[in-house]
Amino acid sequence: MARKYFVAANWKCNGTLESIKSLTNSFNNLDFDPSKLDVVVFPVSVHYDHTRKLLQSKFSTGIQNVSKFGNGSYTGEVSAEIAKDLNIEYVIIGHFERRKYFHETDEDVREKLQASLKNNLKAVVCFGESLEQREQNKTIEVITKQVKAFVDLIDNFDNVILAYEPLWAIGTGKTATPEQAQLVHKEIRKIVKDTCGEKQANQIRILYGGSVNTENCSSLIQQEDIDGFLVGNASLKESFVDIIKSAM
């Protein structure tokens, strides 16, 4: 079945009011049909309102993290309830950097997704293997464990997007070849099929998120089971529009 392509800009902990204004101006100049392509920008949370006001309505926006806790005495957290109240549409869950620096676990990812879905937020859920795990031929074993930790929670497979992040390729300039990425994406779809059913596996979108740039995006997007990108550093440049174009 034809799945709607999805391109996400994860700005991580970057940006100023002025740089965001310049970047969104260049994004707005790109003409695309949002009924055929989802483009979602994830700024730093405190820049969310500024970014949303600057971007044209054809773009969607989200935040890079959400709390597994509800409202209450959780200093520094942003609950799914608050995100919903602010009309935030998307959240990123389980990004490699959250797992690495903030020690988030598969159980944390599950609880965050549960809170997000309860509040009708759409989620990009990330997972992937380390270089050591890849070299030990444990890629599929690791990814199966990560995906099965949360996939049973999904009831609307249009509202949850999977993002495969080979950890060894994030911010390193290295990237999986299109063939390597496709092989893993195919296995991810099989995991969803075995757990949830064939219809759901064919419906869910799976993004690639390992050092995507203007040089490799066109060959990656041609792969059957790659439905778009989660882009980090390259989304902070005006040339990000060329990555979007590869999915048009």
From Swiss-Prot:
InterPro entries: Aldolase_TIM, TIM_sf, TrioseP_Isoase_bac/euk, Triosephosphate_isomerase, Triosephosphate_isomerase_AS
Signal peptide from the UniProt entry: none
Domain of life per record: Eukaryota
Entry's Gene Ontology cellular component terms: cytosol
Residues the record marks as active site: H95 (electrophile), E165 (proton acceptor)
Binding site for D-glyceraldehyde 3-phosphate: N10, K12, G171, L230, G232, N233
GO molecular function: identical protein binding; triose-phosphate isomerase activity
Gene Ontology biological process: gluconeogenesis; glyceraldehyde-3-phosphate biosynthetic process; glycerol catabolic process; glycolytic process
NCBIfam families, alphabetized: tim
Known partners and oligomeric status: Homodimer.
Protein name: Triosephosphate isomerase
Species whose genome carries this gene: Plasmodium falciparum
Origin organism lineage: Eukaryota, Sar, Alveolata, Apicomplexa, Aconoidasida
